[in-house]
């Protein structure tokens, strides 16, 4: 799907940004994560993957804050997959700040430092920007991917989540060729 207007990207000049829109509670996002991880490992140097937690409703905000706090603390690589596992395998409720704080402490993270960043204005700003980006791409469900600020695809459009990354690879070629 080609967007009617270009969406701003954060990727450095000379690179193409792919945005994954996700929600930690989404079982489809959880199932897609291993495929996305494998795809990310083989990305060419001119492609940058950015993960963006969606905020369809107010209930999504604690997990948006969780993601951006992990990112701010440099813990995304260590804990991103663990958040999915905590929710989908261990069946923990990580939908509120209090339960998130309890879980984060069990991961060996300084709860006070985490809490200060979680409640910070900077994380609040990033949550708002994420929701604005999701709206600019017209995200209706997750997981979904934006490509180069010009294209958008998801499992329904591609026929399955298994085909989404093939579609993204095709769209990357289009962006590179200037189409």
Predicted features and spans:
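Extracytoplasmic/secreted envelope proteins and their assembly/folding machinery
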Residues: 33-40, 63-67, 80, 97, ...
């Amino acid at each position: 799907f080609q967007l009617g207007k270009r969406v701003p990207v954060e990727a450095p000049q000379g690179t193409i940004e792919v945005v994954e829109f996700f929600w930690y509670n989404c079982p489809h996002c959880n199932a897609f994560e291993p495929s996305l991880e494998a795809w990310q490992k083989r990305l060419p140097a001119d492609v940058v993957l950015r993960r963006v937690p969606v905020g369809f409703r107010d209930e999504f905000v604690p997990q948006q804050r969780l993601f951006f706090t992990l990112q701010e603390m440099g813990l995304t690589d260590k804990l991103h997959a663990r958040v999915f596992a905590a929710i989908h395998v261990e069946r923990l409720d990580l939908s509120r700040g209090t339960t998130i704080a309890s879980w984060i402490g069990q991961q060996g993270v300084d709860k006070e430092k985490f809490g200060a960043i979680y409640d910070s204005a900077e994380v609040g700003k990033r949550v708002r920007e994420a929701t604005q980006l999701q709206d600019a791409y017209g995200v209706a469900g997750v997981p979904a991917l934006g490509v180069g600020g010009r294209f958008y695809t998801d499992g329904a459009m591609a026929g399955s989540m298994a085909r989404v990354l093939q579609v993204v690879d095709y769209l990357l070629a289009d962006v590179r060729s200037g189409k």
